[in-house]
A protein has these predicted regions:
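Basic nucleic-acid-binding alpha-helical/helix-turn surface characteristic of O6-alkylguanine DNA
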Residues: 1-114, 162-176
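Active-site phosphate/pyrophosphate-handling residues
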Residues: 87, 129, 158
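Short glycine/serine-rich loop segments
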Residues: 114-155
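…primarily DNA-binding HTH/wHTH and HhH modules…
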Residues: 140-176
Length: 176
């Protein structure tokens, strides 16, 4: 892909139609279902995409289908993202499926021990949901807070249950 070119690809998931924006640097954003994503052209066998783009889409679909998947292989296009948010997203990507961290844990891990609220703000504007697994970040004492995906906190809780996160058990992400 040439410098500054981008590709937007929509695909169907259990949550609805999601989309990714991909550039020469990698994944630039993930869009969770909305009226706007429903109108985009869908991924098909006829659409020419790289193996990395296809693997990223397959990984996101797998996670939203209830399959535990590790998406740390996905290259991120972080141009325009400030160093603090980059650090938050990098730290969040280290949280493996089945694990959780608090906003305070992330803040301490990036050298900002009093920055839990700033971490929360950074994750609230996470342009890479699912790939940067903000659903694995919880409030102090494991309290569920903020999640912008359809279904909000209930979806966050189901995703954590599916992954077997401590205190959340395991359960099917979406029932029939």
């Amino acid at each position: 892909m040439d410098t500054n070119q981008q590709m937007i690809v929509a695909f169907d998931t259990q949550l609805g139609t999601c989309a990714i924006r991909w550039t020469d640097e990698g994944l630039a954003s993930v869009r969770l279902p909305s009226a706007r994503t429903a109108e985009l052209p869908r991924l098909s066998d006829a659409l020419s995409v790289s193996d990395e783009v296809r693997a990223t889409i397959e990984g996101i679909v797998a996670v939203l289908d209830g399959v535990v998947a590790d998406l740390r292989f996905v290259a991120l296009d972080e141009r325009g993202i400030d160093p603090f948010r980059r650090a938050v997203y990098a730290a969040t990507r280290t949280i493996l499926p089945g694990a959780i961290a608090t906003y305070g844990d992330i803040a301490r891990s990036i050298g900002r021990p009093d920055g839990a609220r700033d971490v929360g703000s950074a994750l609230a504007s996470n342009p890479f949901p699912i790939v940067v697994p903000c659903h694995r970040v919880v409030g102090a004492n494991g309290k569920l807070t903020g999640f912008s995906a359809p279904g909000g906190l209930a979806t966050k809780q189901r995703m954590l249950q599916l992954e077997g996160a401590p205190g959340f058990g395991q359960q099917v992400l979406f029932a029939g």
